[in-house]
């Protein structure tokens, strides 16, 4: 399996949210977006907020971060293939408020497909790209125990074909 950095997907949409409106007995409601981020903009994620990132297409890939935070800060990244919609209607199988990452369709939604990172005592930004796992996802949901600054975020596809093995192109 090869990480194809040359095929890296950049975020198409990214927003932070905190809180929910319109929840009821039959629906989780809708997220309250606190900030939307432009492509290539540094993302500052405060503790207590959730970042949702849309990479624009589903892929077998790993998220790749260039980020910084205080030592001991724990970041959790949850990949998902779709977002909750329809006001988070429980009868439609939604597992959270509209706009949040949907994970009920995963075999091990609570214990699998989870990426945790704990920041060490370093100066400046750290780079992290997992090399011993991969996920199938289009979206990621990111939370942290303290403020995190994300300078760069990409989704790096995995494949069994290196760039050098390619023999043609599709146009």
Per-range role (PLM):
Residues 1-171:
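Extracellular/oxidizing-compartment recognition motifs
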């Amino acid at each position: 399996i090869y990480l194809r950095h040359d095929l890296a997907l950049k975020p198409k949409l990214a927003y932070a949210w905190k809180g929910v409106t319109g929840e009821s007995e039959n629906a989780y409601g809708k997220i309250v977006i606190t900030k939307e981020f432009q492509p290539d903009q540094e993302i500052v994620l405060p503790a207590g907020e959730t970042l949702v990132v849309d990479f624009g297409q589903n892929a077998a890939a790993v998220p790749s971060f260039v980020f910084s935070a205080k030592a001991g800060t724990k970041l959790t990244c949850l990949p998902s293939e779709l977002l909750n919609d329809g006001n988070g209607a429980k009868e439609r199988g939604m597992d959270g408020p509209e706009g949040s990452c949907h994970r009920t369709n995963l075999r091990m939604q609570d214990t699998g497909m989870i990426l945790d990172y704990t920041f060490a005592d370093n100066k400046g930004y750290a780079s992290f790209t997992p090399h011993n796992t991969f996920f199938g996802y289009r979206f990621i949901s990111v939370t942290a125990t303290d403020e995190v600054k994300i300078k760069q975020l990409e989704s790096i596809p995995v494949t069994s074909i290196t760039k050098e093995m390619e023999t043609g192109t599709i146009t």
